[in-house]
Amino acid sequence: MEKFRVHGPFTLSGTVDISGAKNAALPILFAAVLATEPVTLTNVPDLKDVDTTFKILRKLGVVVERDESGAVQIDASKIDHYVAPYELVKTMRASIWALAPLVARFHEGQVSLPGGCTIGARPVDMHISSLEKMGALIELDEGYVKATSNGRLHGARIYMDKVSVGATLSVMMAATLAEGTTTIENAAREPEIVDTALFLNAMGAKISGAGTDTITIEGVERLTGCQHRIVADRIETGTFLVAAAVSGGKITCRGTKADTLEAVIEKLREAGMEVTVTEDTITLDSKGQRPKAVNIRTMPHPGFPTDMQAQFTLLNVVAEGTSRITETIFENRFMHIPELNRMGAKGEIEGNTAICHGVEKLKSAEVMATDLRASISLVLAGCIASGETIVDRIYHIDRGYEHIEDKLRGIGAKIERFSTKFEE
């Protein structure tokens, strides 16, 4: 079992190159299944979840190669297998995205019910019901979702009862090769959906309205090859901005876009931080000041992202004042608070709200990561706590943060990865 040993307290300052967004790379990799010709993707992050996706694609018969520059070539022209198996899918919920492209192009697909982070219910029901409205026949059998269609799927009006990034992406992929026009109402508006639509359109799809709550897709008969650069990771960007805010530092995030992160930047400014933006950089300068407490309510984009909630929990537990953080997207997403409390934080959980009473300093402790974003908040807590903090279960971090130790060391953190042969 791998762990991080983090020494503190240190001020985190410097420049960080932001990686491609995991939450765009994964759906785009699965969407490449729709193309009859090879596609080339650049800015694909080097992550566990990306590797798992490569393995799933290869299991389907897709040729996947990453060259020395990091570019990924995907050739789905010779797919000969239509099942995404349990042993791969169990580690990653995003694997449900294999289903829509398979049934859209080959009229059949099977995906094991997925795994991933343990942050409450993330049902696949909306993916399934939307495909059924487009003419797919769905069976749930022995832990697998099996989808078939009699010829091409057909366009439909799909109203999302709840704003869902995953289901919006599934429908968008399926609709590209459907007969007729599909309209998604109450669609998710995340930048990663916009990026996936840009990729699909580069392959010849006809998608309009991505980034708004109504997306229209006119089906085409086939999709062809293209080149596409994955959008920068706004959550990684936000994470490093928070690192500067909580440590009294100044960090510039390079190769990123401020317009994908407006709610987060607004809250950082409200916390008393100076944030300056250019076309492709965002800089946070704390001026050595302690942040002020800010209330947070997670919402679908363009609201405050749930994937930044844990980082702002850390900010609030070391801020001046008391704050309330309300989580409206996922259940059970405050598992980092008891761990932060072990480090001297004063956080309470009341249902879907956390109340944070700011303290001046954290102290080191042994803590355990519970999901991807919680884990990075514990690592940053270790960077600003006095003494040596051990963070366990860091495999969560490797799912979503590329070369995290190198990037943290580059801004002044003292962090090392080590292995224990067995769990005590």
UniProtKB/Swiss-Prot annotation:
Active site: C117
Sample GO molecular function, one term: UDP-N-acetylglucosamine 1-carboxyvinyltransferase activity
Annotated compartments: Cytoplasm
Catalytic activity from the UniProt record: phosphoenolpyruvate + UDP-N-acetyl-alpha-D-glucosamine = UDP-N-acetyl-3-O-(1-carboxyvinyl)-alpha-D-glucosamine + phosphate
Its EC number(s): 2.5.1.7
Presence of keyword Cytoplasm: yes
Record InterPro entries: Enolpyruvate_Tfrase_dom, Enolpyruvate_Tfrase_sf, MurA_subfamily, RNA3'P_cycl/enolpyr_Trfase_a/b, UDP_GlcNAc_COvinyl_MurA
GO BP terms in the entry: cell division; cell wall organization; peptidoglycan biosynthetic process; regulation of cell shape; UDP-N-acetylgalactosamine biosynthetic process
Modified residues (2-(S-cysteinyl)pyruvic acid O-phosphothioketal): C117
Binding site for phosphoenolpyruvate: K22, N23
CDD domains: UdpNAET (cd01555)
This protein's UniProt keywords: Cell cycle, Cell division, Cell shape, Cell wall biogenesis/degradation, Cytoplasm, Peptidoglycan synthesis, Pyruvate, Transferase
NCBIfam families: murA, PRK09369.1
Sequence similarity: Belongs to the EPSP synthase family. MurA subfamily.
Function: Cell wall formation. Adds enolpyruvyl to UDP-N-acetylglucosamine.
Name the record gives this protein: UDP-N-acetylglucosamine 1-carboxyvinyltransferase
Organism: Actinobacillus pleuropneumoniae serotype 7 (strain AP76)
